[in-house]
Amino acid sequence: MKAGRYRIARDMTNNDIINSLRSQNLAVTVAFNNQHSLGLLAQRISNQVEADSLSLMGVFTDSLFLSLNSFSKESALAMYLPNSYEFFWNTSAKKIRSKLQKAYNIFWTSNRKQKAKAMGLTPVEVSILAAIVQEESKEFTEQPRI
């Protein structure tokens, strides 16, 4: 048996439960919107998976990782795009970070980077601006004006 998330129903037999524990580790949907800090993001994610907020903060602020990906501790929050992600409950903090980084890299296509550059912005600045706009108005129709 491995650590994880499992579903056990009332009508399951002992054999069904054992088979479930052996082979049916369920994915957890981890969702977050704009967070105001890496600490709040780590706390939000740690409430939904086994990894604790300290281990998440450790990998989120790892200076080697940040420098290899052209981020600083101040801009690192922009790498973690608000969305829903699926993880197994016992996914390590490093694997969580890797999946979130991969989503960031997939999102920022060369076309999107060119559009940002045409507006005189970097991808990090676009993320910051988007977070401000979303925070200032929860009314979707008002957001383009802001």
List the model feature ranges, each with a label.
Residues 1-146:
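Conserved catalytic or metal-liganding residues and their short signature motifs at active sites
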